[in-house]
């Protein structure tokens, strides 16, 4: 444990041991990072690993990363709606199946962030979007999506009821994700969070 398994940059210490312990490299959070700091972390890290995942990246940060890696022959992909940057190739041999579900179209950015992260880490993902409880038939007409799932991720704002409904339909682990979508007494996602925490269906 005392061995140095990180890249020392002064302003950051990029963890090299994470990939050996967890099976995938440390994820880089772009949120709040200076572009110079972010690009330097990426440049140093990509020399030691075959792929990188950067989350909460703005377009300007992606452009800075792409410019920095311009001379290196490596694939750089930006998913604007999810604010994710993939560097390198994703796993081709997918393991398991995860369904990512969201209640409304406004919840898609959160759902896509989860879905793309799962794909980056090597899982097969089935997406089912805009199936909130206001039109429950949309969900019930697509329940076959849950067949063979190892896990389900459900994102919802407003009243946050969708995870409880899905929880009553599946036997695999379910991760409920509240979003800030809503108005009135939604309190920027707090209402959805409390609904999910008090769900009576197994999750």
Each predicted region: which residue ranges?
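Glycine-rich phosphate-binding loop
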Residues: 142-179
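Glycine-rich phosphate/diphosphate-binding loop of Rossmann-like nucleotide-binding domains
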Residues: 95-135
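Long amphipathic alpha-helical segments
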Residues: 1-72
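C-terminal binding/interaction regions
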Residues: 102, 181, 185-203
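Short glycine-rich or small-residue beta-strand-to-loop segments that form or flank ligand, phosphate
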Residues: 27-28, 52-53, 97-103, 152-154
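Short glycine/serine/threonine-rich phosphate/pyrophosphate-binding segments
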Residues: 36-38, 107-112, 136-137, 156-165, ...
């Amino acid at each position: 444990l005392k061995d140095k398994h990180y890249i020392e940059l002064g302003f950051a210490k990029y963890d090299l041991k994470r990939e050996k312990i967890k099976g995938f490299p440390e994820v880089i959070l772009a949120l709040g990072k200076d572009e110079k700091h972010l690009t330097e972390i990426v440049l140093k890290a990509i020399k030691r690993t075959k792929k990188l995942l950067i989350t909460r990246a703005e377009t300007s940060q992606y452009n800075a990363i792409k410019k920095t890696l311009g001379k290196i022959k490596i694939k750089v992909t930006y998913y604007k709606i999810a604010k994710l940057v993939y560097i390198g190739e994703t796993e081709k041999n997918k393991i398991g199946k995860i369904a990512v579900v969201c209640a409304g179209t406004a919840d898609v950015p959160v759902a896509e962030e989860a879905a793309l992260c799962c794909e980056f880490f090597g899982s097969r993902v089935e997406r089912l979007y805009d199936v909130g409880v206001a039109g429950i038939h949309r969900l019930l007409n697509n329940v076959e999506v849950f067949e063979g799932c190892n896990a389900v991720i459900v994102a919802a704002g407003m009243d946050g009821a969708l995870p409880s409904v899905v929880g009553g339909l599946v036997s695999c682990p379910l991760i409920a994700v509240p979003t800030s979508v809503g108005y009135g007494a939604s309190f920027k996602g707090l209402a959805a969070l409390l609904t999910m925490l008090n769900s009576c269906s197994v999750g």
